[in-house]
């Protein structure tokens, strides 16, 4: 990808080339959310830990490969975010920074909030807006959500949320949304970093993927964020 070429050139000559910027537009996983808990007022809140989010790991990898190249990360993830909201805030949260590349990752919340046609329309709008501004794009599919209600979830309000999330996963709804999204990306020559398929491979090989979720709902553990990072590096070098 052009962004890899820019990193390589910056690494060779730190004075002649500008710093590289990569934006990440997505939901809670992109923002860096992990465990959840019940607040004093009965609401549900999440633990924020962006230092262990996948884009932080990606930066570490790229800094290892191109140690002299300045790399700026733009975290445009918002907990609870959907593709529709991403399109609405793309100017404020992404384009104003003129990134060289943007990784787009939506789907987890979309299945519970919007129909598939709205999801497809919003993603199409995001892709078109980025491409119009000359920003390289990668569409990254998310992790799997829970395939059972974990015994680790004790609070009834969180278990209730988990039931809806579980249904969207085991019914095949999330997979349906992501297949549609991948087709849109391919039609626009946008590389797809298909992490969802890797999670499905783990499940089909007997791995309890629900145990790989920090909140046992839809946020991957800190260690599993490395899967996103390494997968993105592969995508960046292979396209």
Predicted regions and their residues:
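Extracellular glycan-modifying ectodomains
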Residues: 92-100, 108-111, 116, 129
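Cell-envelope and extracellular/periplasmic
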Residues: 28-29, 38, 42, 46, ...
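A short helix->loop->beta-strand "cap" motif at the edges of active sites that frequently abuts
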Residues: 132-137, 190
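Structural motif
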Residues: 80-88
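Catalytic His-Asp segment of secreted/periplasmic serine-dependent ester chemistry enzymes
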Residues: 144-239
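Serine-esterase "nucleophile elbow" of acetyl-processing enzymes
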Residues: 1-76, 89-98
